[in-house]
Curated annotation (Swiss-Prot):
The keyword Flavoprotein applies. Substrate binds at residues 65, 110-114, 170, 175, 240-241. Its EC number is 1.3.5.2. It comes from Cereibacter sphaeroides (strain ATCC 17023 / DSM 158 / JCM 6121 / CCUG 31486 / LMG 2827 / NBRC 12203 / NCIMB 8253 / ATH 2.4.1.). This is Dihydroorotate dehydrogenase (quinone). The lineage of its organism: Bacteria, Pseudomonadati, Pseudomonadota, Alphaproteobacteria, Rhodobacterales.
């Protein structure tokens, strides 16, 4: 991390977390943030669920909810971006305060509740983004007051799919009441059928991923793996934030909401490895949760991920983190004799299944 980035982070950490978040996006949009540009190599370039990625380090949904800083983020060293979640209608989300830094734990808790500008506005921004080598996907959400949340996911995909490189069905946010109920076999099967019917009508392929919670039993994971394999989706994103609070030291540890960051790493990686075992490598997995270094990204890949995503770690290490992780990952692959990311996927899975 350079001196400028460190100074900016110090200033941001003196602000309310949500205001700091908004200011960081404004700084990116205005061109005030030095950006490293694309990061790739023959080892890092990979294909995940039909997406051609310059590197496997992605931006998780939730940072740029409304797709306002895409041009800058495409130059920030990420191999792919995910914006949203978008819901059919705009909604304000839950009352503030709803974002909390847990500095001692290198973590955050949020209870945003899918606050966003709505699908129509976000779709328009996706359509106007610069085209390049970095795929941009959309996280699909449901309105809090919707009488048919499953239909909401299909509606957002229908509206925005033509302007997105991929889409992620988010049934795992803990901040919309009963949303996680859609992870059950019957509900999930019906939901994915509706989404895939919409996808089938597009003129070009738009891979669909499913984002799951980390707070699932082995039986739950087995059901999800079975449904996912039968549905025709492109892959699974594992995982969203957790409701667990094990071992936290920060004053905000008991705030309601989803916990992200370093404390999530082991829990989410064990879920990832279990899914890799259940799907027998037939379904690409994207590992999310606590990735803050090249070593942690590499661990996720060796546990079964074809790519990774990060967000909370940037709160503590800055926007340059993605490029640093990608370069470090390249060095780790070279060190261990892997010619590509794909060669390393799942090679350490057994370590996470004990």
């Amino acid at each position: 991390m350079n001196i400028l980035e460190r100074a900016a982070l110090t200033a941001l950490h003196r602000m309310d977390p949500e205001k700091a978040h908004s200011l960081s996006l404004s700084a990116l949009r205005s061109g005030l943030v030095p950006l490293p540009g694309p990061v790739t190599s023959p080892r890092l370039a990979t294909v995940v669920g039909g997406l051609v990625l310059p590197n496997p380090v992605g931006l998780a949904a939730g940072y740029d909810k409304n797709a306002v800083a895409l041009a800058a983020l495409m130059r920030a060293g990420f191999g792919f971006l995910e914006v949203g979640a978008a819901t059919p209608r705009p909604q304000p989300g839950n009352p503030q305060p709803r974002l909390f830094r847990l500095t001692e734990d290198r973590a955050a808790i949020n209870r945003f509740g899918f606050n966003n500008d709505g699908a129509a506005t976000i779709c328009a921004r996706l359509a106007m983004r610069p085209r390049g080598a970095v795929p941009v996907g959309l996280n699909l959400g449901a309105n809090k007051d919707s009488p048919d949340r499953a239909a909401d996911f299909a509606a957002v995909l229908a509206a925005c799919g033509p302007h997105a490189d991929f889409a992620t069905v988010n049934v795992s946010s803990p901040n919309t009441e009963r949303l996680r109920d859609l992870q059950g076999r019957q509900a999930l099967t019906a939901l994915l059928e509706g989404v895939m019917q919409v996808q089938a009508g597009f003129a070009r392929p738009v891979p669909v991923f499913l984002k799951i919670a980390p707070d699932l039993s082995d039986a739950d994971l087995a059901e999800i793996a079975e449904v996912a394999l039968a549905s025709g989706i492109a892959g699974i994103v594992a995982t969203n934030t957790t409701l667990a609070r094990d071992g936290l030291r920060s004053a905000h540890a008991r705030e309601t909401g989803g916990l992200s960051g370093a404390p999530l790493f082991e829990r989410s990686t064990r879920v990832l490895a279990r899914l890799s075992e259940l799907t027998e490598g037939r379904l690409p997995l994207i590992g999310v949760g606590g990735v803050a270094s090249a070593e942690e990204a590499y661990a996720k890949i060796r546990a079964g991920a074809s790519a990774v995503q990060l967000y909370t770690a940037m709160v503590y290490q800055g926007i340059g983190l993605a490029a640093r992780i990608a370069r470090g990952l390249d060095a780790l692959l070279l060190r261990d004799g892997f010619g590509s990311v794909a060669e390393a996927v799942g090679t350490g899975r057994a370590d996470w299944l004990t």
